[in-house]
């Protein structure tokens, strides 16, 4: 469970992620959004899976994860997470030519967000800071910003450099 924040723009942050993250991060994002919409946080209702069943949030798994807590700190953070999730499923479609199972739940979450807050999702640009869920040497490094910390964290994984098979042009220069 993480949000790889490589850029303040959630779309740009999604586009540079490796194939593996483009496949798995939409589900992790949807699970976080489901938890935010549950009674553990906002109590805005259930996020439904593609098959119409709700994501199970009764046990509140990951409710204390730093990324979930960050997303719950403000509606702007929540908007950023939802828009990032929508950007991830769009990137999945671009790379794989298929609709990700989390596309519908994330776009429905966007509608719920608007209904409950009266804000449009573009309010994500009001995010003031992001959390760092990464090894301590990067998490506590005040000499670099959060975007650089996440880029460094991703680049440190040996498998990442060769994980842009679907579209090598998506591989950023910091990998």
Predicted regions and their residues:
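An N-terminal structural lobe/cap that precedes and organizes the functional/catalytic core
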Residues: 1-100
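Phosphate/pyrophosphate-binding catalytic cores of soluble transferases and nucleic-acid-acting enzymes
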Residues: 84, 107, 121-122
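Primarily interfacial, aromatic-capped hydrophobic alpha-helices that serve as membrane anchors
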Residues: 100, 107-113
């Amino acid at each position: 469970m993480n949000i790889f924040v490589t850029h303040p723009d959630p779309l740009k942050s999604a586009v540079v992620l490796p194939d593996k993250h483009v496949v798995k991060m939409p589900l992790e994002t949807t699970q976080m959004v489901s938890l935010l919409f549950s009674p553990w946080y906002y109590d805005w209702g259930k996020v439904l899976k593609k098959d119409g069943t709700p994501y199970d949030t009764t046990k509140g798994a990951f409710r204390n994860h730093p990324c979930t807590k960050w997303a719950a700190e403000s509606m702007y953070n929540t908007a950023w997470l939802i828009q990032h999730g929508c950007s991830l499923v769009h990137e999945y479609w671009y790379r794989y030519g298929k609709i990700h199972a989390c596309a519908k739940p994330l776009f429905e979450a966007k509608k719920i967000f608007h209904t409950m807050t009266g804000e449009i999702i573009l309010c994500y640009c009001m995010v003031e800071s992001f959390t760092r869920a990464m090894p301590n040497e990067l998490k506590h490094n005040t000499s670099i910003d959060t975007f650089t910390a996440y880029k460094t964290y991703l680049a440190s994984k040996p498998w990442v450099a060769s994980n842009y098979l679907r579209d090598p042009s998506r591989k950023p220069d910091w990998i």
